[in-house]
Every structure is written in C-alpha cells, then in structure tokens.
C-alpha cells in the first residue's frame, strides 16, 4: 500500500551498496538510490542484482526511493 502522494515505478536493481541501499534503474532510464522497506527487512526478503522491483518515490526528492516489492 503506497503512502499518500508517493509515486510507484518499476525498475531493475543495478548494484547493491552498503547499508542495505541499492542503485535501481527505472524503466524510463533514470537511476535512483533506494533502500529496502521495513516489512521487507522484517520478512528477510533478499534483493539481488538484476531483480525486478517496485520503487516508491517521494514527490519531493525523485533521486531517492524505497523498494516495496520484489517480483518473483
């Protein structure tokens, strides 16, 4: 469930970074810095390079986001 005002877009994980951060390339070609949502951490959902994910972006800063779903 998206937060009010958040923008959900799909993308592909390009590289893992320290502190559970990931560089994600969106379908429109932009690259954003994303972290894992709390529920995904709670349930130990692993994210690997090349995974397809849904990223939730804030309308205030479109260069950072939160990974909220990983496709199987």
From Swiss-Prot:
All copies of domain S1-like, residue ranges: 1-72
Similarity remark: Belongs to the IF-1 family.
CDD domains per the UniProt record, alphabetical: S1_IF1
Gene coding for it: infA
A Gene Ontology term for the protein's cellular component: cytosol
Oligomeric and partner information: Component of the 30S ribosomal translation pre-initiation complex which assembles on the 30S ribosome in the order IF-2 and IF-3, IF-1 and N-formylmethionyl-tRNA(fMet); mRNA recruitment can occur at any time during PIC assembly.
Keyword Iron: no
Function: One of the essential components for the initiation of protein synthesis. Stabilizes the binding of IF-2 and IF-3 on the 30S subunit to which N-formylmethionyl-tRNA(fMet) subsequently binds. Helps modulate mRNA selection, yielding the 30S pre-initiation complex (PIC). Upon addition of the 50S ribosomal subunit IF-1, IF-2 and IF-3 are released leaving the mature 70S translation initiation complex.
Localization per record: Cytoplasm
Annotated protein name in UniProt: Translation initiation factor IF-1
